[in-house]
């Protein structure tokens, strides 16, 4: 009989979808095993027969499915206002590029966010965060990028820090100052990039407000040369990088980010084979964002077969934002990734667990159920993982465990 220490907690009578690639079964499924949690981490996974059937801190889950906590590795959670009017314009025929050129798009949200009080931004973001937590999300990336000036970018990152301090969900904050050219720099995008590189990145990094630097390399964002300046600045300071690339056109952004060993290349609808090869060589995760593809009514799909062939890890994220993916649901993103992009259910699950963890640099501690990993997991009223993906309007969450505590 396995000896338990005081304070150990056990989940038994469960189906474990470990998402551990070392296990041969789909989803890393194992039956007749129990999960032992100690001090916020998974201590061990052991046969049921090694443990008592009942006792203090032993939870009988009556055969329910247990998976790692979900990870949303790409969100723009902190913002004010909405862009419903722009969506109506698009329904009437206007393009995303046209709306952006007219001062809409990202800059419309920038104006609303700059004017919004920090406490109001916090309350708005907290409600969104709790919606994701209610779906089983235990690790969440939050980007800045709706300030486009030092003071407001810092304000957004402070909100992310305040959310993290609640200890309800892990937050991975990202500086996305190179999101768009603000109105005051409309005729001088290079000057704005200088501000980002010489002021925003070093000052906000020194304050410990973010974990990685992101950028938008696109015709409506920044060109390759401007993007590389951002990457060079970040890497000189030892900051991990990532990029929004190849969403609306092929500029070579994925190759660029991969040359700097980027954590991830996100969107990637127009990614070509050279870009896929570069991502493999750079250890860069491909992050699929089907919500934006759907909402913008795009037709160019990411090259999923190429990503498989080159064995590039593929993550899936909500891309929750007010302009192009107003979907605060990772379950929906998983379903969309399967229906629109052709992922299997198992690939979608890997995309919101172990591959999403890799996209945030957390692959050694998050995204799998195995010894020494964080005890972040979800108990579902389901028998098979596909059930969560299949019916996104229904939330079968039974219990969410964060750092070993039922939350």
Swiss-Prot record:
Biological processes, Gene Ontology terms: L-histidine catabolic process to glutamate and formamide; L-histidine catabolic process to glutamate and formate
Pathway entry: Amino-acid degradation; L-histidine degradation into L-glutamate; N-formimidoyl-L-glutamate from L-histidine: step 3/3
Alphabetized Gene3D superfamilies for the sequence: Metal-dependent hydrolases, Urease, subunit C, domain 1
Cofactor note: Binds 1 zinc or iron ion per subunit.
Binding annotation for Zn(2+): 74, 76, 244, 319
Cofactor(s), by name: Zn(2+); Fe(3+)
Binding annotation for Fe(3+): 74, 76, 244, 319
GO molecular function, one term: imidazolonepropionase activity
Cystine pairs: none
The EC number(s) this enzyme carries: 3.5.2.7
The entry's keywords: Cytoplasm, Histidine metabolism, Hydrolase, Iron, Metal-binding, Zinc
Annotated binding of N-formimidoyl-L-glutamate, by residue: 146, 321, 323
Primary location recorded for the protein, binned into one broad class: cytoplasm
Catalytic activity line of the entry: 4-imidazolone-5-propanoate + H2O = N-formimidoyl-L-glutamate
Short name of one Pfam family: Amidohydro_1
Enzyme class of the recorded protein, top EC level: hydrolase
Alphabetized SUPFAM superfamilies for the sequence: Composite domain of metallo-dependent hydrolases, Metallo-dependent hydrolases
Top-level lineage group: Bacteria
Compartments reported by the entry: Cytoplasm
Function statement: Catalyzes the hydrolytic cleavage of the carbon-nitrogen bond in imidazolone-5-propanoate to yield N-formimidoyl-L-glutamate. It is the third step in the universal histidine degradation pathway.
NCBIfam families (UniProt xref): hutI
Record's protein name: Imidazolonepropionase
Species lineage: Bacteria, Pseudomonadati, Pseudomonadota, Gammaproteobacteria, Enterobacterales
